[in-house]
Structures are given as C-alpha cells and as structure tokens.
Design a protein with these regions (language model features):
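N-terminal pre-ligand scaffold of iron-sulfur
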Residues: 1-71, 85-86, 99-117
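Short cysteine clusters
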Residues: 53, 77-80
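A short acidic, glycine-rich active-site loop
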Residues: 74
Length: 117
C-alpha cells in the first residue's frame, strides 16, 4: 500500500466518534453470512455485541445501521421490543428477559475501537 492508504490495523472496528453518543453503529462481519457487530456508545465508553437477538436469533435492527437506543442506556430489538442494557447486554424487558446479547471483547485506543478477540 502507498503512504496515502496506510495498512489497516488488525481488528479495527470503527472510530469512537463514528458512533452517535448514546447510540449504536453496525459493523459488518468479515465472513459472509456471519452476524455483524453492534457497537453502542455512552460518552467515552463503548460496548460491542453480536447483532443477534437471543429471542429468535435475528438481527436487532430492521434496516442496516438503524438501531433504537434510549437514554444512552438501552438498546431495543426492532422486532419484538426486547430492551438490552448497554454495559452488559442483559435483557431487562421483553420476550427474552434474563437472556443477554453475546459480548464482543473490544479495546479503545486513541478513540479507535478494536476487536480484542
């Protein structure tokens, strides 16, 4: 690659500032057919999960990169309104209450988010 296109960092998902504060961003899976990753943000903190609702094993969103987030605390599944906490992915209301999203380990370095798996 040339100097204008630096080699990408392994595991790079997105920049923290790509995610609306209090919102979510979808990162496509590297492998075709695999679920993507949803990254949620509150201020300088972020958490990542597989974009799969534990209720019916379907994506949390209807449309690409369109998520319902409330008060920078909860992420809602667009299909059956299950509500998941940002910080641990735990469903606190809805048809899969008590279940949790599958966490993706991440790290934040200089406002960039990397997959830590």
């Amino acid at each position: 690659m040339n100097a204008a296109s630096p080699e990408p960092h392994p595991g790079f998902l997105c920049a923290l500032d790509d995610i609306p504060d209090g919102g979510a961003l979808e990162v496509a899976a590297e492998q075709a057919g695999a679920p993507g990753i949803v990254v949620v943000r509150r201020g300088d903190d972020a958490w990542a999960y597989r974009n799969v609702c534990p209720h019916f094993s379907i994506p949390l969103n209807y449309e690409p990169n369109t998520f319902w987030a409330y008060d920078a605390e909860l992420l809602m599944c667009a299909h059956h309104s299950a509500m998941f906490r940002f910080e641990d992915g735990q469903c606190i209301d809805g048809p899969c209450q008590g279940a949790a999203l599958t966490r993706v380990a991440i790290r934040i370095e200089q406002r960039n988010i990397f997959n830590n798996d």
